[in-house]
Amino acid sequence: MKFDLKRYYRSFIYSNLNDTTMLICGILTVFFSFLGHSIENGFFSGFLKSAYQTLALLLGNYDFKATNIVSKCSLYIAIVFTLFFYCSVFIKLLGKKLRTWFFLKFFAKNHIVICGAGDMGYALAKDILNKHQDKKLLVVDINPTNDNVNSICTLGGYAISGNAIDKDVLNKLNITKAEKIILMTGKDISNLEILDAITKVIPEADKNDPDNKKNVYIHLESKENYEILQSIKEKENDKVSLIKTRKDISNSEILDAITKVIPKADKNDPDNKKNVYIHLKSSMINIRAFSVYDNAAQTLFMKHPIGENVDTIDNGSVNLAIVGFDAAGLSVLYRALALGHFFNGKPLNVTIFDNNHEKKRAEFLKLYPISLKASGIINWNIDFKDDGRLFNKDGIENFNQIIFCKTNVQASLTDIARIIKNQSAHLENKQFFIFIDKHDGIKGIANDIKIDSKNKVDIIPFGNFSQICSYDVVVNEIYDKMAIRADQRYNELHNPGTKYETKWNTLSPFLQDSNRMQVEHLPIKLKAINKLLSKNKFLEYLEYDEAKEKARNRWFDLMLNDQNVSDINEINLWDKTEGAKIEGAKILATYISLDDIEKLAKMEKHRWNAFHILNGWTTLPKPEGQNYPDRKDNNKKEHALLIGWDELEEASKYIVEDGKKPHNYKSDDVETVMRAYDMIVSAFEDDKILQDENSIYCKEIFEFKQKIDRIKNK
């Protein structure tokens, strides 16, 4: 094993090893000095003189005379240990400060700054230092006694204590030269305050450096705070862009011309003031909000889709229990409601168990003022109960999946053990999930829990901080790989000739989340598709041309004023011979019946409706006898298509958009189904990630890809 001198030095100065070394060197100095002088002076008669000379040597007086070879060696050894002692004292007093000062003074450029060294911040810092050693890391924490700070420095990072809201602290961090700034204090309000302070410091420092863009990542536990974040973004760009071209230099040139023209025209009207607003990119800060609890829910349902252990093709109902309703429980519920839409059309039933269920119910409805019961386009049933009811004799009998989201992991383990002990008769075909945050060791414990000496319980850990707080997740957005590529692929199909590389970063958080949910619902659709393909044994229902024609009549045609308007370009994406086409669509149209494709499209419609409802959208009312004024109103959050599947075709007749051909909006949901294979192959060049048992992707994705590949290669 290669000796790492730098790592040893860091371990030395940031651990108790330095204190121990200082103590040992001090003791050995006294011992050998006293021994040497005692040999010269006499052990008893010269005791006081030897003690005095030992103290003098310890303080740096090396002027001594030794006639005996043993005393001479002893005194020289004492001098060596004295030097080590003083080195330890120096390192104790100044070593840490000098190392940090040297970095801040000369190397704090293009570095990563993490604000907050709590459990989440420490997990991220540790991941960066262990797996991304080319990165320079600087951490600030408000607590000077935080043990994680020393641990970060020992691993090779740099850390200081201070309040990042303070402008002086931000300047000390050289925040204006940072490559990335990640706010993970553990409290939303603190993260927002730091962000606000950063938006004041950076524009001042960067006014002469317009190309120095900053990427800020802010952890927000509550989705309500995304609205506050939007206000900060708007304030940071509060200059309304009445002059806005693609380049700042063009804006400046126009402004310069205006300042020359206006004074001449207004010389006889001195009170006629002009307000000119100019868009400058130099004031832009790229801000991305994230939640590790959303990451946890995302990994859970990508690996283990809702209803994984239920027959959702025929008559099975998915009954989900969420135990503990804090940040993790809320994120799990949000994703469950957004994704829990099945082939058989049955609503998702969710019960939240919490020891303060009435309060949590009220808080949930403040955040999501939605109906809790299935009706109209609502396709879920939600109930809140006291968590004690889960431990009744038949408490878990009706549930398929039970997800423990308590902040106290030990309490969750105890609850599971109690259920196994008292309700063993109801454990068959049940899945238990446990949120483990920083307790990675729970994985092994969960895997070892048994009903008896032979039969294990299916307990699946999720949400370990080492995974959901990693650099690849927080910064590189690795979990969004499929969503990003699906969005780019959509634009390739429908807007050929444009650039897609930076498209994702320009999307609002709402649209980014919309793409995520579309991709994350894919495993639930694929469960049905895989069963349909197996059931059909790869037999063709129709010749492709016949299937395409019937599909066009069913979903792409629209009767307007007794004339049939067909969106032929959209369905031609299934089998284009030139340019971009939807990979795999032709196979799905041939091997799955149109009735089943429509059921899958209805699933997608239910999912799309649920996502918009959860995000505060309502149905845009249609004026009687008139067309819709718009397809959607972003300000009021009203959408004309927030209706049932059966109403889509009729509503499509009254949506008229400038420059766009009339369109049967049923085809949009059908296209999402037909893009299933395309989404997968466009995101993954090979099957390695999909085959990896440790990846976040469920077996349904790889199984589906294999089936389509086999048909293609027939």
Predicted regions and their residues:
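Amphipathic, non-membrane alpha-helical rod segments
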Residues: 629-648
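Cytosolic regulatory regions of ion transport systems
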Residues: 2-575, 579-602, 644, 648-654, ...
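Short, motif-level signal for alpha-helix interfacial/capping segments enriched in acidic residues
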Residues: 486-491, 624-630
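C-terminal accessory/binding modules appended to enzymatic or scaffolding proteins
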Residues: 595-605, 609-616, 635
